[in-house]
UniProtKB/Swiss-Prot annotation:
One of its GO terms (molecular function) is glucosyltransferase activity. Its EC number is 2.4.1.-. It comes from Arabidopsis thaliana (Mouse-ear cress). It holds the Pfam family UDPGT. Belongs to the UDP-glycosyltransferase family. UDP-alpha-D-glucose binds at residues 292, 358-360, 375-383, 397-400. Transmembrane segments: none annotated. This is UDP-glycosyltransferase 92A1. Keywords: Glycosyltransferase, Transferase.
Length: 488
């Protein structure tokens, strides 16, 4: 028999230290706060935990009226061989990402101390924890102190399922073939070795990444459930996989997207982008952006620039310095692009270059935008699908390759342009893919139609009145969390 629902609820959220994790956690926290304000029967408090330098980043993403409290756990990056500002994925080169992952395990005891403290303070309140999959030890700590806990994955279920299976089993090491099936996820289809990020491809079970993953992933079984930033109608295969291998509830609650943060970029950039888009015909623009952490080779930049110019399509390109060039301040794009490129596209008004950051949601929601050339990060995919914009995929790292597989092979809203940061890519190949999706080809018409259909599926998932699948998922999670009695 279920216990009576407690009157008060304390929600503790702990994202990993990276903007791609923090921002979805903030978006989920704000959604939960909104739900709890509407449900006045319970007094609810929400806290977010992180390290000292990440607390201001979280605070900057919260509206001033939010009552979400921020809790700082002690952490000194220099104690772990990291730069003094090395508390966030975004501030580190890829070579040091594993060092931050390993260092995060030092937060376990401070987290336990914090949980012990609030359990003494909260009395009869129900305390639940929402943790990050890179902080897999959270589940065990919560089980030991008697607190209900779930993982919130900012990644989709299909992508994370492939990621989990490969790290635990390293199936590509068992075959000389270029393609292989996943041991416990064969329904995902064949994976190609070129669809593995560099750390996976080089893994042998004794390398730093393998050792870390084999410590963290088994800890996922200590959690009482999973929340996924995804939509059941497009990610059922991945959700079913996690239900099968974990035996615990798995809830889709996406898309969990934060409203655009107007403080990130300058007002002049937003106005320039809007004015430029307003001047273009409907469905005529290619938007190119590879996320906040990814850069491409300078040779790739040259080929991409030539392709965008040769395609004769309008485009917005968010330009970052190429791989190997660390430029934290302003940089001159002319040094990395074909001679006269910026002047020609400015004169013709056919292209707009934006440095480092652009108002992505504003661009994707604009009627002039036709297709998104993306690194296939999950947040970018959700933003694109939410606005009915098909994709040109160029996956580069992490689970992005598997996201690309899902979008192209299983959903049909994407065409892969390139694969990885070291691939060979030619101007003509990019041009042909752009035209394939944007012009009146059979493939292009079908992909654009499918993207519009998926937009409607995503919209319905979040509709309150008719109880969309993600609305139901979040309600079921909260209902279970409120009555769950954790067995010690």
């Amino acid at each position: 028999m279920a216990e009576a629902k407690p009157r008060n609820l304390r929600i503790v959220m702990f994202p990993f230290m990276g903007q791609g994790h923090i921002i979805p956690f903030v978006a989920l926290a704000l959604r939960l706060e909104k739900i709890m304000i509407m449900n006045r029967a319970n007094k609810t408090t929400i806290s977010m935990i992180n390290t000292p330098s990440n607390i201001p980043k979280i605070r900057s993403n919260l509206p001033p009226e939010s009552s979400i409290s921020l809790i700082e756990l002690p952490f000194n990056s220099s104690d772990h061989g990291l730069p003094h500002d090395g508390e966030n994925f975004d501030s580190l080169p890829y070579s040091l990402v594993i060092s931050l992952l390993e260092a995060s395990r030092s937060l376990r005891e401070p987290f336990r101390d914090f949980m012990t403290k609030i359990l003494k303070e909260e009395g009869q309140s129900s305390v639940i924890v929402i943790g990050d999959f890179f902080l897999g030890w959270i589940g065990k700590v919560c089980k030991e102190v008697g607190v209900y806990s779930v993982i919130f994955s900012a990644s989709g279920a299909f992508g994370l399922g492939c990621y989990r299976s490969i790290w635990l089993n390293l199936p590509h090491k068992e075959t000389k073939q270029d393609q292989f099936l996943l041991d416990d996820f064969p329904e995902a289809g064949e994976i190609e070795k070129t669809q593995l990020n560099s750390f996976m491809l080089e893994a042998d079970g004794t390398d730093d990444w393998s050792v870390f993953m084999k410590k963290i992933i088994p800890g996922w079984s200590d959690f009482d459930g999973f929340l996924f930033n995804t939509v059941a109608e497009i990610d059922q295969m991945g959700l079913s996989y996690f239900r099968r291998i974990t035996g615990v509830p798995v809830w889709p609650v996406g898309p969990v997207l934060k409203s655009p943060d107007k403080k990130v970029g300058s007002r002049s950039t937003e106005e320039a982008v809007k004015s430029w888009l307003d001047s273009k015909p409907d469905h005529s623009v290619v938007y190119v952006c590879f996320g906040s952490m990814n850069s491409i080779l300078q040779t790739h930049m040259l080929e991409l620039a030539m392709a965008l110019e040769s395609s004769e399509k309008n485009f917005i390109w968010v330009v970052r310095p190429p791989i190997g060039v660390e430029v934290k301040s302003e940089f001159d794009v002319k040094g990395y692009l074909p001679e006269g490129f910026e002047e020609r596209i400015t004169r013709s008004e056919r292209g707009l270059l934006v440095k480092k950051w652009a108002p992505q949601v504003d661009i994707l929601s604009h009627k002039a935008t036709c297709v998104f050339l993306s690194h296939c990060g999950w947040n970018s995919i959700l933003e694109s699908l939410s606005h009915g914009v098909p994709l040109l995929g160029w996956p580069m790292a992490a689970e992005q390759f598997f996201n690309s597989i899902l979008m192209e092979k299983h959903i049909g809203v994407s065409v892969e342009v390139a694969r990885g940061k070291r691939c060979e890519i030619k101007c003509d190949d990019i041009v042909s893919k752009i035209k394939l999706v944007m012009e009146e080809t059979e493939v292009g018409k079908e992909i654009r139609k499918k993207a519009r259909e998926v937009k409607e599926l995503v919209r319905r998932a979040m509709v309150d009145g008719v109880k969309g699948s993600s609305v139901i998922g979040l309600e079921e999670f909260l209902d279970q969390a409120m009555v769950k009695k954790v067995e010690n």
